[in-house]
């Protein structure tokens, strides 16, 4: 479904999870997914609808799954994982009346996610297993997993953690989150040779063992008000280092998320809000 071929009017729902906002399209009738140009047009905050990511809800792909979905960044590039988006898909399905249970499975581009409704506009999503092996993140130039990697960045030495939550993340611990060099370091790390598929860059400040503050510079979107997979990435990297406990609140500019990782080798659970903002019609 391209800009020229899109069937107008196009019905959509605007949703947000902790300020991370989405344009959600219902394509369960078999309508082709949008191409990169249409995604970028829809995501444009001046000439389109405006969002961090576009989500298409599609028919289920597996047994026991209620629906599948795809995600695109604001620049039109495909995304593999999005924790806030998964919760918004769940909230959309609940609002649509498509569910008979408060515990269900939805299919992302990388895996099936178990979702539970835990309160009004609150959902818990099982995000799967964190991956620390460099070749699977992917992270080049390091044969073995480390708690901290040392990179050269335009003459500076940068220390970061790295993990995949279905998409690659670098995690930089800082002393003061409000003055973290997000707009400078974020793009440089995304272009670094160590990250051949680019990377989402999280800047995290530990407040206490149960509370951290986080800002994320996302692939294809820049800094966003919240990033669910980024919250999981920051939390598990800090847990591996012993900096925080196994149940931590992550405060982002758009709201607070909860990340639980009870045991290494087990799945990570992300909990937080997901809300419908409005329904609309796009006329192109």
UniProtKB/Swiss-Prot annotation:
Pathway: Amino-acid biosynthesis; L-lysine biosynthesis via DAP pathway; DL-2,6-diaminopimelate from LL-2,6-diaminopimelate: step 1/1. The record marks 278 as: Important for dimerization. Keywords: Amino-acid biosynthesis, Cytoplasm, Isomerase, Lysine biosynthesis. Gene3D superfamilies: Diaminopimelate Epimerase, Chain A, domain 1. GO terms for molecular function: diaminopimelate epimerase activity. The active site is at 82 (proton donor), 227 (proton acceptor). It is an enzyme of class 5 (isomerase). It is found in: Cytoplasm. It catalyses: (2S,6S)-2,6-diaminopimelate = meso-2,6-diaminopimelate. Disulfide bonds: none annotated. GO terms for cellular component: cytosol. It comes from the Bacteria. PROSITE patterns: DAP_EPIMERASE (PS01326). The keyword Cytoplasm applies. The record marks 169, 218 as: Could be important to modulate the pK values of the two catalytic cysteine residues. Substrate binds at residues 20, 53, 73, 83-84, 167, 200, 218-219, 228-229. Its EC number is 5.1.1.7. HAMAP family: DAP_epimerase (MF_00197). Catalyzes the stereoinversion of LL-2,6-diaminopimelate (L,L-DAP) to meso-diaminopimelate (meso-DAP), a precursor of L-lysine and an essential component of the bacterial peptidoglycan. Belongs to the diaminopimelate epimerase family. Homodimer. This is Diaminopimelate epimerase. It comes from Xylella fastidiosa (strain M12). The gene is dapF.
């Amino acid at each position: 479904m391209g800009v020229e071929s899109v069937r107008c009017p196009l019905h959509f729902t605007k949703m947000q999870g902790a300020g991370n906002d989405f344009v959600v399209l219902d394509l369960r009738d078999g309508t082709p997914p949008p191409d990169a140009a249409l995604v970028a047009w829809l995501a444009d905050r001046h000439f389109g609808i405006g969002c961090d990511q576009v989500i298409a809800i599609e028919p289920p792909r597996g047994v026991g799954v209620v629906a599948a979905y795809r995600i695109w960044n604001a620049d039109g590039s495909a995304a593999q994982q999005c924790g806030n988006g998964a919760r918004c898909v769940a909230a959309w399905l609940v609002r649509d009346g498509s569910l008979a249970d408060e515990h269900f499975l939805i299919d992302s581009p990388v895996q099936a996610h178990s979702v539970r409704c835990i309160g009004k506009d609150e959902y818990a999503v099982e995000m799967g297993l964190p991956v620390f092996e460099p070749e699977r993140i992917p992270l080049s130039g390091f044969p073995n997993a480390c708690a901290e990697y040392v990179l050269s960045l335009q003459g500076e030495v940068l220390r970061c953690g790295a993990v995949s939550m279905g998409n690659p993340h670098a995690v930089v611990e800082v002393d003061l989150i409000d003055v973290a060099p997000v707009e400078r370091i974020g793009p440089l790390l995304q272009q670094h040779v160590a990250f051949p598929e680019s990377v989402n860059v999280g800047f995290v400040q530990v407040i206490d063992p149960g509370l951290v503050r986080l800002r994320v510079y996302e692939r294809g979107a820049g800094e966003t008000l919240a990033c669910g997979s980024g919250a999981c990435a920051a939390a598990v990297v800090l847990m591996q280092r012993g900096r925080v406990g196994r149940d931590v609140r992550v405060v982002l500019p758009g709201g607070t998320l909860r990340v639980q990782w009870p045991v290494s080798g087990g799945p990570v659970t992300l909990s937080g809000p997901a809300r419908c903002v409005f329904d609309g019609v796009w006329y192109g």
